[in-house]
Amino acid sequence: MPVRDAEVGDIDEICALIEEHAVYEGRHDLVLDRAEMTKHLFGADPRAWVLLAEPPGAGTVAGFAFCCWNFSTWQGRPGIWLDDLFVRPEYRRHGLGRELLAALRARTAGRVEWDMQEGNEKAVAFYAELGAEPVHGWVRYRWSPS
């Protein structure tokens, strides 16, 4: 399986993937602070982790899953929040997204949850193939610092 846990030496690649994903989604101004991201992923108190997909023989990172733990009080167990899933366009349709999600699924007996932008019909079809379902009746809120 070409999926592995990211290491501190991967920070430039991780940030590049996030920035590429932002451009893909139409946001061209995102530039991440590598030092801040390193602290959050690999510091004394990590807040998230990243899985990287590296196809055999490709010699490059093709995609990633950016995750953190969450907790379901109703299930009484931890799950995984998938904040970002991105496979570079030239590596799509080769099973890497499926392998990244399978690696997440293997890490928890709880739920794996994520958001997606409305209108992404390719993603809807992909997630349905996996057996994932939209959560009807819930609205996501965001409370940003002032």
Label every PLM stretch briefly:
Residues 2-16:
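A short beta-loop-alpha structural element at the N-terminal edge
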Residues 15-40:
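Conserved GNAT-fold acetyl-CoA-binding loop/helix
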Residues 40-52, 81:
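A short helix-loop-beta-strand connector motif used in the catalytic cores of GNAT acetyltransferases and
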Residues 52, 60-69, 81:
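Conserved beta-strand in the GNAT
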Residues 71-82, 92, 110, 136:
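A conserved beta-turn-beta hairpin within the catalytic core of GNAT-like acetyltransferases
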Residues 75, 88-102, 118-125:
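Conserved glycine-rich acetyl-CoA-binding loop
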Residues 88, 99-111, 133:
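Conserved acyl-CoA
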Residues 107-108, 113-124, 142-145:
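Conserved beta-strand-loop-alpha-helix junction that forms the acyl-donor binding cleft
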